[in-house]
Amino acid sequence: MADILDSRPHAFSIKLWPPSLPTRKALIERITNNFSSKTIFTEKYGSLTKDQATENAKRIEDIAFSTANQQFEREPDGDGGSAVQLYAKECSKLILEVLKKGPVAKVAARELISEDSVSPRETFFDISKGKRAFIEAEEAEELLKPLKEPGNAYTKICFSNRSFGLGAARVAEPILASLKDQLKEVDLSDFVAGRPELEALEVMNIFSDALQGSILSSLNLSDNALGEKGVRAFGALLKSLSSLEELYLMNDGISKEAAQAVSELIPSTENLRVLHFHNNMTGDEGALAIAEVVKRSPLLENFRCSSTRVGSKGGIALSEALEHCTHMEKLDLRDNMFGTEAGVSLSKTLSSFKHMTELYLSYLNLEDEGAIAIVNALKESASPIEVLEMAGNDITVEAASAIAACVAAKQDLNKLNLSENELKDEGCVQIANCIEEGHSKLQYIDMSTNYIRRAGARALAHVVVKKEAFKLLNIDGNIISEEGIEELKEIFKKSPELLGALDENDPDGEEDDDDEEDEEDEENEGNGNGELESKLKNLEVNQED
């Protein structure tokens, strides 16, 4: 039997930290009871009111948790036992301090705990305020002093808006190296502005080497004109990031080659939740590389690839890659050259999303076919859309009924932007009709520059002015008659702030096709009984259950 049974102890890895949310809540309740119930301590020092007890209990637990968590982060390979002990010790110490203060008036409850002894230590170090300027060695020595203090608790640093030279970078190097076990968020955006290329690249190398091996959750390298050379200068750091959750590479000159370098140098994207590539020259080939990063990021929630010169080929690649990102909440692809085919491809992806709240698809050349495919997909999806932007896509009245059906289905909608299209009166009235019932959260509508006349503007105004949460209607840049403008002002008489400026409206303007209504007939509609408006009001929105 002894040969069969191995009596040696087996190694189990049980993590004791962090405590679960229910555990933390239970501790807060116990602390509250210690303050307000009859105990030997409250008999000696006095008890607190229920409100005072609750307020202080929450504060004590939060401070103790923060202190213990910092301890745990310094020894990530441990089981968390020391953090648990520190958590309990801090709570006990702070509870006793509060009790010794004795009961005080409620107005002074926030001062029960000594600020010197329990205030959380500063965790965010930021030098970005003030004027944009070069920083050299001497100033860096003085500016970065707080980071050298023993036992500091900084987990987030921002060096943005200050241009580091070689001297300043060498001052920062050992300081950053000493902090890399505690840093979680690093913002190095716009930190080499105006430096010669060779110096800037060397500065990047220094920072990369200093931070290599950090357990960062967020890295911002935006506004540095990186290009491929800059991306590779940060190669050591990028390769070492195994827990990265947020990466920002905006306005960085990310070309095809730079995008390929990003894909190559970031091997671990399993935890990536936020990825921003706004305002780069990525193009279709670069988009293919970015698509590979997206494919490897199943937890991605927030993806921005706006103003990146991506055409149909790249748009289709990104759309297909996004199918792997079922947690997507915010998607921004504005200002690219997707076209109809990429729009249809994107619609297939959108139909599977369940958590999407913000969707920015303006200026993508979607046209009616792409727009209809997208809104039909959204209508059928479970996504609780709050923001929908499809401005500047050459959308005409042909797509209006599909858009209206989608909007009608999305009762969480907060903002709708359909500006710079060609929806005209008919499309505008369909949008107005679909939001007449419900949509209690709706705050902003932008239908500017849509060849809208008096009838469409009036229909929309009558609907939104009744919504309690509504804040702004933008219908500027249209062709509303002078009488129509006066009517709008009358509708918004009690709340003029809800109607945006009408400086760009052209009362004498004309539609660019042969189907326009004669302005004279429109003005003769009187109280809205004209034939056009009568027909529009009877339009139905086909909404499936």
Curated annotation (Swiss-Prot):
What's the protein's topology in the membrane?
Peripheral membrane protein
According to the record, the residues making up region (WPP) are 1-116
Kindly state which keywords UniProt assigns to this record, in alphabetical order. Answer: Cytoplasm, Cytoskeleton, GTPase activation, Leucine-rich repeat, Membrane, Nucleus, Repeat
Principal subcellular localization: cytoplasm
Annotated region (Disordered) at: 496-545
- Cystines in this chain: none
Biological role: GTPase activator for the nuclear Ras-related regulatory protein Ran, converting it to the putatively inactive GDP-bound state.
Present the record's domain note. Answer: The WPP domain is required for the nuclear envelope localization.
State the family it belongs to: Belongs to the RNA1 family.
Q: What is this protein called?
A: RAN GTPase-activating protein 2
Organism of provenance: Arabidopsis thaliana (Mouse-ear cress)
